Regions:
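C-terminal target-recognition/interaction regions appended to catalytic cores
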Residues: 1-155
């Protein structure tokens, strides 16, 4: 895998010779959700914007679901990965309008700063829970550095 669009962040999480990329399997989506994803990601819309052109795709409970379909944007910081991403995956719609899907476990793990060679085990639901419950590794590293500086501070 060669990515010519590497940046400092991807260089940190993608080690040299990391090999096969695991946990990058798309979950199944129903036909209505696929159509929602297609329209939302193509236009950068929110669910309420569909009312104008595809009222049949508005959820049966629009008040409860008004912010449940969120397209992540390439140029903006990603939304916080939630502990219940396994249930609320529609908050993480992939920004590529040709893909019509939500984030894979690997993509959610990348947002959390897990290196690409870190492998999650168990069912896919369990993998999403592991990612959502985790302290992001780069955050943990920075916190540990601060604690080390305080604990071992010269008196």
């Amino acid at each position: 895998f060669i990515n010519r669009n590497s940046n400092e962040y991807t260089k940190k999480i993608r080690r040299k010779n990391y090999g096969k990329l695991f946990n990058h399997v798309v979950r199944n989506h129903n036909d209505d959700d696929i159509q929602r994803f297609r329209h939302l990601s193509a236009k950068g819309w929110e669910l309420r914007d569909l009312q104008k052109i595809r009222p049949d795709l508005i959820h049966h409970d629009p008040q409860h679901f008004k912010n449940r379909y969120t397209v992540q944007q390439w140029k903006n910081p990603a939304k916080t990965i939630l502990s219940h991403i396994h249930k609320d995956g529609n908050l993480f719609i992939h920004p590529d309008p040709k893909q019509h899907r939500t984030f894979t476990v690997r993509e959610a793990a990348r947002v959390q700063s897990f290196p690409d060679d870190f492998r999650f085990c168990g069912s896919r639901t369990s993998q999403y829970i592991q990612v959502g419950n985790a302290v992001p590794p780069l955050l943990a590293y920075e916190i540990a550095k601060c604690i080390k500086n305080v604990v071992f501070k010269k008196k």
